[in-house]
Amino acid sequence: RRQRDAAVAAGASGIEVDRWIAERFTLPKVDLPTLEGETARFAATMLRSLWGLGSRPLPNLIQLAEFRGIRVNGLPEVAASVDAYSTWYEGFPHVFLARRKTPERARFDLAHEIGHLVLHRHRGPGSRAEEEREADAFASEFLMPAESVVEYLPPNPTIDEILRVKRAFAVSAMALTYTVHKLGRMTDWIYRTTCTALSQRGFRGGEPDGMVSYERSRVFPQILASSKLGVVTGKRIALELRIPVEDVRAAMLDAELHAVPDGPGQRLVDRVRQSAPDRTGRRPVRSGARAEGLRPV
């Protein structure tokens, strides 16, 4: 309970950091449809189509989400029991990631939360367990489209083939094996023996020879590298928002540890706003009433 409360508080801090940035810089507009009522796998296929992704393996998922207007923040160590959660807040989609397991797991967690954002924006009294299954199914199809799995892998693939393709899709070997079996491309017996063999090779709790690092944000390094507003640091933002600097750094996915954005690509922070709006009299999101909408998913 304490760690869940810490995750909610960290989410509130993340929203404050995002608001501070949005008041001073122009960020990508939200391009995330509501696909409630659709099946999870159809929604994943539809979102890929709307975003022009085809069925190919996805690039850096954090940067893809940022480009489509999703605000992606990190969670601090005190929220260790929460892998990720998401919420819509004042018209903006937010995802909060712990990133304490493997980078492949973090990608799946982010895809899972995008599934919640498009499928469960207006939640009713439905089954939370069913929503979790739907978000998992969305993430699987979004990261590993059936069309591509069939193209890349033969029926009943070998472990070496699984490992080769899982690197191409930047997913865990176990997740890919499960997907292949779920698609009817692997017999029950081979599925069990493959999972056993992968477990013996360390793939149950980790990802040997996997991604070398977590995917990085493009937005936060660009904010920190900007000189038009003077030197921008996590400490400065923390002082202006009156929140702990550790919360700011976690919210910014530890971007201060990296001097430059992660590789070439389109600049997401287009320009500095001419003036930041007056915050006087605005009740901060950290207040109890404003934070009620934040719930770990």
Predicted regions and their residues:
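Short juxta-domain linker segments that transition from a proline/glycine-rich
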Residues: 1-297
